[in-house]
């Protein structure tokens, strides 16, 4: 194990290039302090100076504010790495290797923040690095030395690979090898990413030999620029001219934007890097267990806030001021929660957060350093049987069918009109109480695609999954019938591109509610790829720009990246859903939704509930506008044209994001949608005067 002052600390690290959006490689003291503040806010405790020594001031600030530093020498020959002429083996380059490592050590020797020396980056193994290792060990016997390219050889004290698969990490952690495993680069944070970060930290917390790693990387390395139309963008490779070689947006792998705005995936990092963990003991009685993961400090500097939520609404709250938990110790605590049986039939959630009593290390009093959400009583799915609504002393009038129109099947009720296009069987009009709930020309259609993320492009999913982009739907049946006073419309389709059948069923009651069931029956084809998502898509007029939902938030989240986002009731707008990743891609999804409302200023609109928690997104952008196609285009989020309506996606599930790398990795199997049978039911209910 790596020991710091005798303790086997966990390295909750990030790689940091010196980069500023306005001044390039010149980083001011103010910007450095901003970076350290953000690291503290998100529980990052270590930084690797990739791939060169930083400004001396950076080490001084790390000394002052408390960050572990891996001090890396300016030795990189990536371009020669995959040839037979690796500079690490050339005698003519021996002096250059050694002198750069000597200067790195000599200039930073007296900085207590430096706990590890790094010989360099991606230059290959060989005698030149062996000489550097021997010199450093003779010069400084107190600090370990690491070098990724040395692998398991003697001239690295730490096994510090890059982007090691989960399984390979576990295999090493279970082996008889004696060197600690600390990845010098892992969890490639490119674009909408960091899915599966939990799986890394499950292993790190399970195996003492696996002590963490350094995320690649801290900040998106783009500069502020204006395109030919005068639109301000963050520029990346290829934006400056067409003739210089570039790696496109491969410089944008950050946890934060160039302007130091946390990217949505940063919140997941902050959660799994936290050092106070809460576990349920008997939540019915308010009993929890606290584990202090810190190695050098107790919890006396913090207080605990707790909240009890019933179906997402705050019903009780309290504070515990004294937390006497020693480093690496556990303690049980009983919170003053009333009888939970008084909230019968409601989903009960217990939120706890740990906050600073006083300001420290650039953080304000009351800042939350750790949190947890625990289920006291589980969520119960709603009754999905749709029947006519009986009004007091008024006989309900069943909806009727008008099949006389040549283009549309029309369903009418006392206060609504619903139309289905006869040519394809899709819902095409939804008017309730005089209000059009679907955009003119829009339809409710099956959807299996998303705008590929950077990781999707790296795994070539835009090619591999291409068959799911608007697969051919050949309508084979279109019927309607009355059933218990409701109208049932059914449409069947052949899907020859994917060897499947699709069935869409709509049950409509007397108030204009619609239960939609999307069912796919897979054929026996063996080579149909996974899907990006399974769900439906529709367009609503732009007046329905308000979002009110009970699910995970407030930031976007995905099936393999939603542990930092708590369940609750959130009130947002459509404009807030789009996150401007430097290159346009999938964004804005929320998961584990119990209900979702799309409302106008008056609080009227549509409410969606499903047979199980579902996913949704609402954007002023189409999927097509965020999709670069078969190959990445030279595009930037501010250049994408918004539409004048709300594009709404309601999904049973969506593919996870992955994080092992951005050049082939895809989400863990449990976060994928393999070819097979799927069924998804949800109810669309017109609502009025809902408080936003």
For each feature predicted by the language model, list its residue ranges.
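Short linear motifs in exposed loops
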Residues: 12-13, 226, 318, 334, ...
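Extended substrate-binding grooves/exosites of carbohydrate-active enzymes
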Residues: 1-289, 294-300, 305-317
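Intrinsically disordered, low-complexity Pro/Gly/Ser/Thr-rich segments with frequent PxxP/GP/PP motifs
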Residues: 303, 309-345
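A short acidic/small-residue loop/turn micro-motif
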Residues: 16-19, 322-324, 522
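Beta-strand/loop-rich accessory regions of lumenal/periplasmic or secreted enzymes
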Residues: 336-345, 360, 374-692
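Extracellular and select intracellular beta-sandwich modules with Ser/Thr-enriched
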Residues: 316-318, 367-372
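Short acidic/polar inter-strand loop motif in beta-rich domains
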Residues: 354-362
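Exposed beta-strand face motif in extracellular beta-rich ectodomains
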Residues: 346-350
